[in-house]
């Protein structure tokens, strides 16, 4: 049956295109995703009120709110018999779990009664027409590394963080006073936990200017758990102006989720970091940044050396 209807959903990870034949969901792609709109009829028309679209939007709202085991809308996945077998195997990978391409290939091989390669399975995974609901983001490389996600590795990392820890990362296009106040609190907790080199009174002095910095930075990414901010990143062009994570959430991938989105989706390539904060320096080095300039004082002329780092 031709795919004749479309609608759009604004997810925390960007706009998504939904497609349907009128009865079932046949496509769900992130903006800019490889193979997006595959099989879409040239005369497909927007139709927001289709019941299956309403069901899909409801599922997506629940999913991005951290709800588990929500009944998905009706699906119709159109592909080759081999692709269909791979997609069926994907649907059996539970929420919050992961599988390697080799493990998935073994499962598909058992279904087919013959051996199949991880490469062939990977190709079919990449052609999955219904992202998120059919969990191709749960497939990892042989050593557990993130590889090959048609919607972008930063989205794969974000989806896995959502399922693992309930962390949702979004761009804050609006910055109400309550959000700014919550982020200032995250900033202070983070600074007090990591910036023990600051002189007395510096935290209070700096806190007074953080609200203006948050409101003025062009791009602001916010990581939340149960609706509460646990980290944030601000970027201006290719420069990361700020990155702070609540100390209770350090070591759980929040900073990595934010930086991955900043570098891959926003084009950020540079950052400055306090030289006296070795954990932060090591974090950026681990992500592939290297120092190219040092200043003996910070931007305000205070005695806090800065390292300017660039993504290799």
Could you describe each region identified by the protein language model?
Residues 256-257, 276-305:
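Conserved active-site alpha-helix within GNAT-family acetyltransferase domains
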Residues 245, 251-264, 282-286:
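Conserved acetyl-CoA-binding loop-helix of GNAT-fold acetyltransferases
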Residues 222, 227-244:
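Conserved beta-strand in the GNAT
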Residues 264-276:
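Conserved GNAT acetyl-CoA-binding A-motif
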Residues 185-211:
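Conserved GNAT-fold acetyl-CoA-binding loop/helix
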Residues 168-185:
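A short beta-loop-alpha structural element at the N-terminal edge
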Residues 211-222, 239:
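A short helix-loop-beta-strand connector motif used in the catalytic cores of GNAT acetyltransferases and
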Residues 1-112, 162-168:
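Basic nucleic-acid-binding alpha-helical/helix-turn surface characteristic of O6-alkylguanine DNA
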